[in-house]
């Protein structure tokens, strides 16, 4: 771990704390000041009786004046999704606050998704007063929101930590159930450090009476900032040189190396260095499904999204030409690895860069070397600095060119003359709708499979739950992304071809079935003045499930809604802040997309309901379903 440095204090209050180290503040205030110190500027959640005393400190003068914002959501699950989206966009810690049992359990699915996809989220849960769990006079009482014992609950007290036990070491990298106010500040800071270190969610259970208790300001004085760089494991100088020398020797001897950009590159904040390395070396580069947009896909040596045998044949063939694969931010799972169909050129060498190891595999010699306990982020930064491009010996096939949207070679049986909107039409049309620097949030659904093979414009940020795949997640995640874009403007842009005065659009691609699960958060987006373009793909139900099984079964149907009438119910009573349009033909879609693409308006919500066929599946979805079926049949 890097040494923690004391940064300069940025305001008068911090200077006051330095001069008065014995100063005390309420613990509730400490929590919110610590959140501000890590650049978490908004908190999501729902009030409940066990967290109200904590929430009151949002309005203490020192916290309120510093700009910490409460974003109340319609339910706790959506708060978890929003906190997830906040972190995915900003690479800061997203935070939600819920109440004992009924609130925290509602959020659990969202937290599980963050855990599965390495998203930094802090879940603060207000629990019963400390005396209720410690005192023999109270601990045997069955409390509301707390499940009783399975047997003899009239005689045995409940397990006050039952929910803590559900999440510890299961969907959280760090959990603190606060019981001693003397160590509470340290426990808060330790959970935050673990969230940064592992890039996974953490929990803090705060007793209702702790918020008002006094704590010292020592931690805020001694460590005024905690950053991800402070929390990851660094190699020694000797280790660093040894690793870099081994990596560069392999690169210099390679004729056809490839860089594979994966999701953990984004989670550990080094995507910019990966793109600099690509620009400096001119090495062919590919993205994974979950690493989509980690690489600037407008670069001249971008070769497409590699997903093994489930990806495009041309991309697969080009990847197979590479004698060395540098896999940055590697995350191995069935979705991200094409149901484990990744293959390499015979005798290729592979280097995997992971937050906990660097792995070098020489398939020709049949051996490998593993450097354990080392985060790849400092390795990537140092590799970019030290690599000598004059020593590269690249000999790529000159007939192979950059991947573009034309590479998809989509077959349209109607030759563009269809009067209905098809998945093929969308794959040809939607990439042109996107501008450099835009932010796209995509729901789990059929269209998500199409987006994989888009060649994105420069500096576009793509956010989607590619592995856990909980439908309904994207809409409240877009709320979190929109809040993060307000708190951390243009955080995703590092150079590229984005116009200097361009204000990025937030675009949500949403399915009708998924939207019905979390649609109410559109009202929160409206309340928070988040500019949003939301496109509802209306194909009358659960299209992915129809592709897998039961295409005409009633269990894949949903009730039809008047999507263009939603906002009157959700708070825009006179239509001043929203505009909704029903689109059923390609020509009308083209006109509307062109209007939005070229508009400078960044206020209000534009909703497009786009009618699609119930049984119209992208080819990428068909391929995945066939691969999954083949895997099932082999068992």
UniProtKB/Swiss-Prot annotation:
Keywords: Branched-chain amino acid catabolism, Cytoplasm, Decarboxylase, Isopeptide bond, Lyase, Magnesium, Metal-binding, Phenylalanine catabolism, Thiamine pyrophosphate, Tryptophan catabolism, Tyrosine catabolism, Ubl conjugation. Belongs to the TPP enzyme family. Its main location: cytoplasm. It catalyses: 4-methyl-2-oxopentanoate + H(+) = 3-methylbutanal + CO2; (S)-3-methyl-2-oxopentanoate + H(+) = 2-methylbutanal + CO2; indole-3-pyruvate + H(+) = indole-3-acetaldehyde + CO2; 3-phenylpyruvate + H(+) = 2-phenylacetaldehyde + CO2. The keyword Ubl conjugation applies. One of five 2-oxo acid decarboxylases (PDC1, PDC5, PDC6, ARO10, and THI3) involved in amino acid catabolism. The enzyme catalyzes the decarboxylation of amino acids, which, in a first step, have been transaminated to the corresponding 2-oxo acids (alpha-keto-acids). In a third step, the resulting aldehydes are reduced to alcohols, collectively referred to as fusel oils or alcohols. GO terms for molecular function: 4-hydroxyphenylpyruvate decarboxylase activity; branched-chain-2-oxoacid decarboxylase activity; carboxy-lyase activity; indolepyruvate decarboxylase activity; magnesium ion binding; phenylpyruvate decarboxylase activity; pyruvate decarboxylase activity; thiamine pyrophosphate binding. It is found in: Cytoplasm. This is Transaminated amino acid decarboxylase. There is a cross-link at residue 588 (Glycyl lysine isopeptide (Lys-Gly) (interchain with G-Cter in ubiquitin)). Optimum pH is 6.5-7.0. Its EC number is 4.1.1.-, 4.1.1.43, 4.1.1.72, 4.1.1.74. The keyword Glycosyltransferase does not apply. Present with 6560 molecules/cell in log phase SD medium. It holds the Pfam family TPP_enzyme_M. It is an enzyme of class 4 (lyase). Induction: Expression is induced by the presence of aromatic amino acids and the lack of preferred nitrogen sources (e.g. ammonia, glutamine) and requires the transcription activator ARO80. GO terms for biological process: aromatic amino acid family catabolic process to alcohol via Ehrlich pathway; branched-chain amino acid catabolic process to alcohol via Ehrlich pathway; L-leucine catabolic process; L-phenylalanine catabolic process; L-tryptophan catabolic process; methionine catabolic process to 3-methylthiopropanol; tyrosine catabolic process. It comes from the Eukaryota. Binds 1 Mg(2+) per subunit. Pathway: Amino-acid degradation; Ehrlich pathway. Fusel oils are important flavor and aroma compounds in yeast-fermented products contributing to the quality of beverages and food. In low concentration they are generally desirable, whereas high concentrations may spoil the product. By adjusting growth conditions and substrate their production is sought to be influenced. Phenylethanol, having a rose-like aroma, is an important fragrance in the cosmetic industry and can be produced by fermentation. One of its GO terms (cellular component) is cytosol.
